[in-house]
Each structure stands twice: as C-alpha cells, then as structure tokens.
Amino acid sequence: CFEPEHVCLDNEIHVLAGGRLREECALLMQHSRIKPGQARITAGHHLPAKHVIHALAPKVTGEPTLELQQQLATCYEATLTLALENDLHSIAFCSLGTGHKNFPSPLAAQIALDITESFHAKHPEIKIIFCPYKDIDHNLYHYLLNN
C-alpha cells in the first residue's frame, strides 16, 4: 500500500519493515506489475521474517465469481510455490483478500484451507501458519481448523 497512514495490513508490514521494503517493492513494480493471483518475494528487512511474499488478491464487487475464486486460490498456490522455491521452512498467511478487496471471509477461508491442506499433504516440511488480521477472520479460522 502506498497510501500514507492508510490502515491496512500491507501498510503496517511496510512500516514495520522499514523504507527498504518500499524501495524494493517499487523496483519490482517498475519491472512488472503483478496481476491478481500472482506473487513476488522480497527480503524482510527489519521484520523478524527473512522474507515477505506479496500476493495480489482479486477485488470483489458483488458476488465472487468462479474466476475470482480461482484467482484467490492461485494467490495461495503462487505464494506456497515461492516458499518452496526459496527453501523457506515456514510461512504465515493473513486472510488474503478479506480487507479492502472485499472477498467474503467464509469463502476466502475455505479456499485458503483447501489449497494449503493440499499443499501440506505434498510438502509437510513447510509449516503453514494462519494469522488473520481481523478478529472475525481469526475466529473463523479457529472454528474451521478445529471442526
């Protein structure tokens, strides 16, 4: 997020990581802008994480179409592929698309769990963590993971 003081997870990550993350993202964007469903990896800079994987969730206006659902699934797949390609041992996900992209939380959570469960069955060496930004998403993931 390049809007100063905008309240969103993306902006908070950039603030905590420091100015170098914004610079690295700006350089990436100069070479090629990502499309919904794609992901890119950068250094973590001042974050405790060594890397940040940036995924672009689709914007939902109205009902989420099958195409938008597939784009969200592809976000998770692309992110997990980057984690694997970069030999990462763990990855933490917020609830992609449920903020200002307006993806309905229950559907987004189910897509996330379907994709990550399938991936984890093939690659159990990578620890997958969910840390949703909003309380409603946190409660939803807690419920779905325990039932």
Annotate the PLM regions:
Residues 1-85:
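Glycine-/small-residue-enriched capping loops at alpha/beta junctions
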Residues 59-147:
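Phosphate/ribose-phosphate-bearing ligand recognition and processing surfaces
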